[in-house]
Amino acid sequence: MEAAKSASGNYKLMTDIDMTGVEWTPWDFSGTFDGNGHSILNLSVKTVSKKTMKTYDGNRKEYETYGAGFFGVLTGAKVTGLNIYGARIEISTTEPCFAAPIAGLADDSDISDCIIKDTYVSLTDSAKMWGTGGIAGFGSGNLDNITTDVTLVCVDTDAAVRDEQFMGGAYAAGFLNIRNCSITIDGYDSDHGYVHDGGLVGMYMVYPLELSKTYQGEVLNNKVKGMITFFEDNTDRRAYCQANMGEVMNWTYAYSGFTSDFKRNETYDYSVTLLPEMCSNPSYSDTVTEATAADFGYTTHTCSTCGYMYSDKYTIHEHKVDNYSVVKEATGTDKKDGIEAGTCSLCNQTVYREYAANVVTDDNEQTAGNKASDSQSKKGLSESTAVFTIIVVVIIAIIIITVVIMVQNNKKKRRHNRQRRRR
């Protein structure tokens, strides 16, 4: 995706994108990104952002923190209408980090009208502050009209650190307004420090850290469904885990319209890392749902031992476009920076594709093929005509020679007969 090379600007996604086989580097961004209702399929993130952002824990201690997600660090950005299906964000680090499907970190940024489905976010960390979120990780701004269905996993690898760990179905920690969001969360948290988990938010706190200001936030008309399974291996126990907010550090917000079907599931066997697979040796069978003109295809994996199920490997249905027209001219390099558009005869959607100026399109390839075929035909015809002409000339020459010989023989015969009569 060429746009990811820019740190700012205004962009609109014009088609669904299957990112199978692409190891995505989180995009640090400060512009406007309009997903236009289109989807990113099979996003895979295994590295953190290039930039860091300052974060704070509940004790107001500061950390330079990395982000991981489709976006790494959003700064004064606006993201709308972006859907994410079948993403796997799997980070292992020793640095402070927050991971989430849309953005790991958000500074005064707005995210709205997005759908996140069948997405897995796992963060294995030994740092002092870290966490996972179902939309964003840590920050400030607004979350509006978002539906997310996520599996979140936090694994603490250093029992001596006594970390500050955060997990939330909407976001892990910070001060983002949350309005009209629907959260489905399946969370797993293995921690040896201080747990801050919530179906909606892990820790709702003052951010940015300007204590002279009064922040009036909004947490309105949200619903949460699911469960967080966790342990807190710490004698100085906190074990914050609630359906809405694990811990609240700032009460200056409007709160109403919250509904939940949520279970807090605390365990006490600290030797077993908590994961979605409830058995030690999962064995999966696969069921493939084919894509249609209206819906994506996907593969559902079911463990025959413990019954755990998840879906991934999303596919886009094949479009049938008879004619494409140029929307953006290519620059004349090998790079595919031109755009063509056509209408699918199966689903009536507008379909876009990239092309390079010096590479002919399928239609042109067909035309070129026809031209080549015509050329070969003409060449073959010309060669055949030449051969025929030669044959005709040879035959005529043979006939002429034959006639000449016959005439000569007749002359000789007549002379011979005259000589015989004289005798």
Sequence positions of predicted segments:
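Juxtamembrane cytosolic interface motif at the C-terminal end of transmembrane helices
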Residues: I400-K411
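Extracellular Ser/Thr-rich, low-complexity/disordered mucin-like segments
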Residues: G369-V393
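Extracellular modular ligand-binding repeats in secreted and cell-surface proteins
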Residues: E277-G369
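Surface-exposed repetitive/solenoidal architectures
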Residues: M1-C279, G369-K371
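Cytoplasmic C-terminal tails of single-pass
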Residues: K411-R423
